[in-house]
């Protein structure tokens, strides 16, 4: 996936119908790859403070094999796919993911689809839904180390997940105890 410049990102997020303002504090942008490689981390996250780009890293905005192929074990309607090209103001607040990992936990409703066709692609299909469904921002490991995880597996069934553990903790440490964190999810353009 292409790495985007600060200006490219800002121009794109400001063009969305859901745009209200650029947050004055830290916020995140996720960019969903056109490739959507099955069970692979092929997306990017960008941390910004107001209009300043702080850092970027790799991850996924899509579910892995567990979510796409075994969704019936936790939700018979399908795997959650967060709606892209949307702003989610104050989406997250610092907390713990599953009580085990420092993370950003869902704080406000998110728009999403339920993908249940088992075709190994995370797709925005069916009706748009909205709700509190536990869409967190977290790492792909409970271990704090410098690994880069290759396969998504069960680490995402809708969550936004970083696979570079060291860079993930840079994001979490930088955000610190900020009250809430906004998110803008984009499709690669």
Give residue spans per PLM region.
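Cell wall/extracellular polymer interaction/catalysis modules
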Residues: 1-153, 167, 172, 188
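Internal interaction segment
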Residues: 172-189
């Amino acid at each position: 996936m292409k790495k985007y410049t600060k200006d490219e990102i800002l121009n794109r997020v400001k063009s969305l119908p859901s745009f209200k303002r650029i947050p004055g504090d830290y916020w995140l942008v996720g960019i969903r790859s056109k490739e959507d490689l099955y069970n692979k981390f092929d997306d990017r996250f960008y941390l910004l403070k107001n209009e300043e780009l702080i850092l970027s890293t790799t991850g996924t905005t899509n579910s892995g094999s567990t979510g796409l192929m075994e969704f019936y074990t936790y939700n018979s309607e399908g795997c959650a796919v967060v709606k892209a090209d949307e702003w989610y103001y104050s989406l997250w607040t610092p907390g713990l993911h599953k009580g085990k990992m420092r993370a950003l936990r869902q704080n406000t409703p998110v728009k999403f689809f339920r993908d249940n066709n088992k075709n190994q692609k995370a797709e925005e299909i069916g009706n748009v839904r909205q709700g509190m469904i536990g869409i967190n921002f977290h790492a792909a490991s409970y271990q704090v180390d410098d690994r880069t995880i290759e396969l998504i597996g069960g680490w995402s069934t809708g969550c936004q997940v970083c696979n570079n553990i060291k860079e993930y903790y840079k994001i979490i440490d930088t955000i610190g105890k900020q009250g809430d964190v906004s998110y803008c999810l984009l499709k690669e353009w």
